[in-house]
Amino acid sequence: FKASEQTSKTLRYGENPHQKGFFFGDLDEIFDKLHGKELSYNNLLDVDAAVNLMEEFKGEAPTFAILKHNNACGFAQRETIKQAYVDALAGDPVSAFGGILIANTEIDAETADEIHKLFCEVVIAPSYTKEALNILKGKKNRMILVQKEVDLPKQLVRTALNGVLVQDKDFITDQATDLTVATTKAPTANEIEDLLFASKLCKNTKSNTI
């Protein structure tokens, strides 16, 4: 990776207003931006976390996540995307304020009506109905992104001391066949399903997750 060979985008500022911020890369490869102000440095960190989290649930039942400070503060998978959003919000409606919202399927008008009640920075989905877009555009600064089908980077890079750390991305997802029952009482099939679901959330949580 050579920053000098990448497209550079000057951000409003870095993590704090007194810090300069830049993005090297092509966001247009990943998103179509339909509405709202420009993404900030902190927005990009949250959006990156949101996209990587939802990648774990690609092609599954309607799933909705609300992120704050790079972590999911609400998450649900339900029969409809509206119910997934409502239940994700119920996880922590306080932290959801000003958060990043992401869905793994199209957002319809009913879901947009619910979202519109919340102050949120960014909404991400693979598509939106025309009615949903009209509702979500009701807030001038709300950023509305359409996520494209794209391969995400297979390596993670960060600076450390006077150099750079590089590691392979964690693509391992636990399966039922990987589990060993270490207790006298074995979990039920539903409990195993819940544990595997939770493990994908834990994998994408930046803390000592339990």
Regions of interest found by a model, annotated:
Residues 1-133, 139-171, 191-209:
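Active-site loops and adjacent core secondary-structure elements that bind or stabilize anionic groups
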Residues 174-190:
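Active-site/ligand-binding-proximal alpha/beta "capping" segment
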